[in-house]
Swiss-Prot record:
Identification of the protein by name: Tagatose 1,6-diphosphate aldolase
Gene name, Swiss-Prot/TrEMBL: lacD
Organism listed in the record: Streptococcus pneumoniae (strain ATCC BAA-255 / R6)
Pfam family, one: DeoC
First-level EC class: lyase
Signal peptide (residue range): none
């Protein structure tokens, strides 16, 4: 993959001195509202969502190589980033139409790659739901959509991070044993599709290829994959792309995510970092709602710091530089 000079400079801004992307993800919108709603009766306000993102940016970006935010509630937080931290901005609308299984992609109406760049971002991030076994008609529509964004990012000379969330149109519960059995095929298949240079993607943000909660040794209940089978899926995922790729934390606990990264590394996955969200900051939501800004800062300086510090230590021994893939 040939990077332009500008894209390379921006990717270096997003990663640490070893070429590892240790990014903090806080572009959650719908998911954040749901988290907040667990701790208060009234609807979460824009001001609350903006302030919490500012607090997390202010307290934790000194320990992250970069931060992913959304232009809807995250712009005030972009001003609170540590000077050394890079910035990614999300380009997609939150959620999807639940009345259909299509999960069509949709850009934020008043944003473009140009506007994201003008806001000071070092990369454009777009989230795509993709079922590799959907109709060719639907998947061609999704592929064309990603081609447009890739072309925009080429025009603006800004890195394009595609986040792929695999799913099955026929299985509603992504946490089920039924879905766990097909997840490796779904995740790896989608990754292969979007490793085609025609999409002009620079970094893939992907799920791990198994539901770790069903892996032998991690599972508390039913086992879907032996350790050997799971390891083979991590290796197959690594071989599915020539692009730099990073893992998303998918809402699991900090400890489980760290253990997953160790397992991935031991399985031969040469991943290039993470975009870690709720696994790092989720506990600050309750502290903020119940006891306000000072309590949230205290949580972020203690438990939040521990989460990100432990994650960074794990990354230094498990992740590899994206420069080895470009």
């Amino acid at each position: 993959m040939a990077l332009t000079e500008q894209k390379r400079v921006r990717l270096e801004k997003l990663s640490d001195e070893n070429g590892i992307i240790s990014a903090l993800a806080f572009d959650q919108r719908g998911a954040l509202k749901r988290l907040m709603a667990q701790h208060q009766t009234e609807e979460p306000t824009v001001a609350q969502m903006e302030e919490l993102k500012v607090l997390v940016a202010d307290e934790l970006t000194k320990y992250a190589s970069s931060m992913l935010l959304d232009p809807e509630y995250g712009l005030p937080a972009t001003k609170a980033l540590d000077e050394k931290a890079g910035l990614l901005l999300a380009y997609e609308k939150t959620g999807y139409d639940t009345t259909s299984t299509k999960r069509l992609p949709d850009c934020l109406d008043v944003w473009s790659a140009k506007r994201i760049k003008e806001e000071g971002a070092d990369a454009v991030k777009f989230l795509l739901y993709y079922d590799v076994d959907s109709s060719d008609e639907l998947n061609q529509e999704k592929q064309a959509y990603i081609e447009r964004i890739g072309s925009e990012c080429v025009a603006e000379d800004i890195p394009f991070f595609l986040e792929i969330l695999a799913y099955d149109e026929k299985i509603a519960d992504a946490g089920s044993v039924e879905y766990a059995k097909v997840k490796p095929h779904k995740v790896i298949g989608a990754m292969k599709v979007f490793s085609d240079p025609r999409f002009n993607i620079d970094v893939l943000k992907v799920e791990v290829p198994v539901n770790i909660k069903y892996v032998e040794g991690f599972a508390e209940g039913e086992v879907v994959y032996t350790r050997e089978e799971a390891a083979a899926f991590f290796k197959a995922q690594d071989e599915a792309t020539n692009f730099p790729y990073i893992y998303l934390s998918a809402g699991v606990s900090a400890k489980l995510f760290q253990d997953t990264l160790v397992f991935a590394h031991e399985s031969g996955a040469n991943f290039n970092g993470v975009l870690c969200g709720r696994a790092t900051w989720a506990g600050s939501v309750e502290a903020y709602i119940k006891d306000g800004e000072a309590a949230a800062r205290e949580w972020l300086r203690t438990t939040g710091f521990e989460n990100i510090d432990e994650l960074n230590k794990v990354l230094q021994t498990t992740a590899t530089s994206w420069k080895e893939r470009v």
